[in-house]
Amino acid sequence: MRTLFIGDLHLSADRLDITQAFNRFLDTELDDADALYILGDLFEVWVGDDLAAPFALELARKLNQVSQRLPIYFIHGNRDFMLGKQFADVAGMQMLPEVTCLDLYGVNTVILHGDSLCTLDKAYQRFRKLRSFAFARWLYSCLPKKKRQAIANKIRSNSQSSNQQKSYVIMDVEPSAVDALFAQSHCKQMIHGHTHRPAIHEFTNGCKRIVVGDWYEQGSVLVVSSDGVDLKSLPFDAS
């Protein structure tokens, strides 16, 4: 048996090829799987469950069918932090805290989206702190639909522009933040996404940090079993 981890699909109506590849993944890659974990940014943008796009609702029905065979767990990312219980229930996804510890075949593992580890990006961390307040999310959800969409589009545009000007180092995880999370969680293994830099980092103290990749040009999935970990790429034309 095996457990699969994915993240950073950034699904949108503008990139239905990614949605199609994800559907093929759901059809072909989950045989004998114990569970599927989605580590955030499943969608490029999410302004509220009441504004879910038609393609997202169709995907929710697909995920719900899959959830009849195996559990699907979801952790919010920085793009879909407004995804709520209403949509999660329709999709058959179980929402997890932003930092979750679990036993993966005998290995204590901490999983998260990963944006909280990029502590050198001070501007983003200020925004992240603001959106962490339940009142701020509630206030946003009370706005008219068009206003919410406009704000989301503005944030997305500003983020893309800002990221182009930020250095490689600032947009990666900060080693001290990684060390702190290992210490706080008492785990030997960490799995996250967000940085779009798939890799398996092994430390001299025996700890391991695994980064799942994005789905812009090809799929990325981490397969964990009792035999170890396998970070795989899935070409869109063959996934």
From Swiss-Prot:
Cofactor note: Binds 2 Mn(2+) ions per subunit in a binuclear metal center.
Cofactor(s) annotated in UniProt: Mn(2+)
Subcellular locations according to the entry: Cell inner membrane
Binding of Mn(2+) 2, residues: D41, N78, H113, H194
Any single GO BP term: lipid A biosynthetic process
Binding site for substrate: N78, R79, D121, S159, N163, K166, H194
Lipid metabolism keyword on record: yes
Keywords from the named record: Cell inner membrane, Cell membrane, Hydrolase, Lipid A biosynthesis, Lipid biosynthesis, Lipid metabolism, Manganese, Membrane, Metal-binding
Residues reported in the UniProt entry to bind Mn(2+) 1: D8, H10, D41, H196
InterPro entries, sorted: Calcineurin-like_PHP_ApaH, LpxH-like, Metallo-depent_PP-like, UDP-diacylglucosamine_Hdrlase
Gene Ontology CC terms: cytoplasm; extrinsic component of plasma membrane
Known pathway: Glycolipid biosynthesis; lipid IV(A) biosynthesis; lipid IV(A) from (3R)-3-hydroxytetradecanoyl-[acyl-carrier-protein] and UDP-N-acetyl-alpha-D-glucosamine: step 4/6
Protein name, entry field: UDP-2,3-diacylglucosamine hydrolase
Organism: Shewanella sp. (strain ANA-3)
